[in-house]
Amino acid sequence: MTSSLPLAAVVLAGGASRRMGRDKATLPFDGPSGTTTMVERVLSVVSARCEPVFVIAAPGQALPELDAVVLRDEVRGLGPLLATGRGLRAAAEAGRSHAFVSAVDMPALTPEIIDVLAGPAERLNADVVLPWDGRDHYLAGIYRTALHTVVAALLDAGERSMRALVDAVDTQRIVLPEQPALANVNTAADLAAILPPRLGQQTAVTGASGTGNSIPN
């Protein structure tokens, strides 16, 4: 069931990809619609629920032509917090109050993950709603776009981690069993282990419970 909450999407594509040994955003991926790149695969998923979509890329990073707004990090290598703040600010300026923030290296992501989070994000007065399947998934959550000001303050204080952001604001966690759709691809072996999901398959997210539950850090 989809939520009526209008969402932007922020896809972080500018990571260093050290363990993969090459840019993960442009890594070929055999998806349900044929061979594509990782960034195009993730965009196809988030675009099913979110508009507009922003891709945060590294300076000079080569990307295919994308149906999204591409923004460049001003400095390379400062981590996801800076990129998240940039994307949230752009989403706020586009008139969206909330955005789904995603890593580029989750090719098994499905729209149903967004649905599971969007309902609680609409009902609860929380700043961040994250999936929790034994660990936090900071880069698969819904964030209030006004948090870009909090991100800026954290960066000014020398913080670089996403945990610093979620610990500083009201964060709700939605308890799920382990979700293959949330798997990150860091190595070639990780990629080989992922079976392409069917877009729109309702069983892609199973057993969501505990709406609004907070898990101790």
UniProtKB/Swiss-Prot annotation:
CDD domains: MobA. InterPro entries: MobA-like_NTP_Trfase (IPR025877), Molybde_CF_guanTrfase (IPR013482), Nucleotide-diphossugar_trans (IPR029044). GTP binds at L12, A13, G14, K24, D73, D105. The keyword Metal-binding applies. Its EC number is 2.7.7.77. Gene3D superfamilies: Spore Coat Polysaccharide Biosynthesis Protein SpsA, Chain A. Its main location: cytoplasm. It is found in: Cytoplasm. Keywords: Cytoplasm, GTP-binding, Magnesium, Metal-binding, Molybdenum cofactor biosynthesis, Nucleotide-binding, Transferase. One of its GO terms (cellular component) is cytoplasm. Mg(2+) binds at D105. One of its GO terms (molecular function) is molybdenum cofactor guanylyltransferase activity. Transmembrane segments: none annotated. It holds the Pfam family NTP_transf_3. It comes from the Bacteria. It catalyses: Mo-molybdopterin + GTP + H(+) = Mo-molybdopterin guanine dinucleotide + diphosphate. GO terms for biological process: Mo-molybdopterin cofactor biosynthetic process. Its cofactor is Mg(2+). The N-terminal domain determines nucleotide recognition and specific binding, while the C-terminal domain determines the specific binding to the target protein. Belongs to the MobA family. Transfers a GMP moiety from GTP to Mo-molybdopterin (Mo-MPT) cofactor (Moco or molybdenum cofactor) to form Mo-molybdopterin guanine dinucleotide (Mo-MGD) cofactor. NCBIfam families: PRK00576.1 (NF001855). This is Probable molybdenum cofactor guanylyltransferase. It comes from Mycolicibacterium vanbaalenii (strain DSM 7251 / JCM 13017 / BCRC 16820 / KCTC 9966 / NRRL B-24157 / PYR-1) (Mycobacterium vanbaalenii). The gene is mobA.
